Amino acid sequence: MLHYKRILLKLSGESLAGEDGYGINAGVLDQYAEEISEARDMGAQIALVIGGGNIFRGVSQAAANMDRVQADYMGMLATVINSLAFQDALERKGVFTRLLTAISMEQIAEPFIRRRAIRHLEKGRVVIFGAGTGNPYFTTDTAASLRAIEIEADIIVKGTRVDGIYDSDPEKNANAQFFPDISYLDVFHKKLGVMDMTAITLCSENSLPIVVMNMNEKGNLSRLLRGEKVGSLVHHEGV
């Protein structure tokens, strides 16, 4: 019995770069695709949002002298590149997928239509959402929250390279405090940087829980779906 039937998995573009620091690491891509394939085989309905920071970040130093709107559109295109790579990796494992983009790209993807996305999920396809929200000034974290609410996901899973939420970077501070369970309000007040404030607000207002977990730990996604305690859970206090 699955603890979560329909999930939205959010991955950063940087995570796809692995140790390379830039671009797409084939080994990481294959590992993540394998994790998603196993979760899909358990009967979970899985949607995916991937950032584009391994290729281009609209708020980066490289874009400092660019028009912000132009830079954000470049970032959206970067997410589509990652989405196409992920689609290929999944389909090589026999997983049926659909790529839906917020900006029309009819030669390579379907336009985002909510009912169509839900129907794909019901048919067992992994749905990848590309191009963010299609609007500048909104992050892929916000896109993930929005899409998760639209498809009525049970939870957002944010895959990272650390075990969950800490009060400081555990890769730099060995004494960082781990939060296995935390409220949306505490995420705000402690400024923990789980997601941007717009994304957290959307989740809070729609009572959509968030799990932050280590995507590099093999089997974590499957364990989470079975109801095992994995990573950090963000939810309403007392729930």
UniProtKB/Swiss-Prot annotation:
Keywords: Allosteric enzyme, ATP-binding, Cytoplasm, Kinase, Nucleotide-binding, Pyrimidine biosynthesis, Transferase. It is an enzyme of class 2 (transferase). One of its GO terms (biological process) is UDP biosynthetic process. Disulfide bonds: none annotated. Its EC number is 2.7.4.22. Its main location: cytoplasm. InterPro entries: AceGlu_kinase-like_sf, Asp/Glu/Uridylate_kinase, Uridylate_kinase, Uridylate_kinase_bac. Pfam families: AA_kinase. Gene3D superfamilies: Acetylglutamate kinase-like. UMP binds at residues 52, 72, 133-140. This is Uridylate kinase. The lineage of its organism: Bacteria, Pseudomonadati, Chlorobiota, Chlorobiia, Chlorobiales. The gene is pyrH.
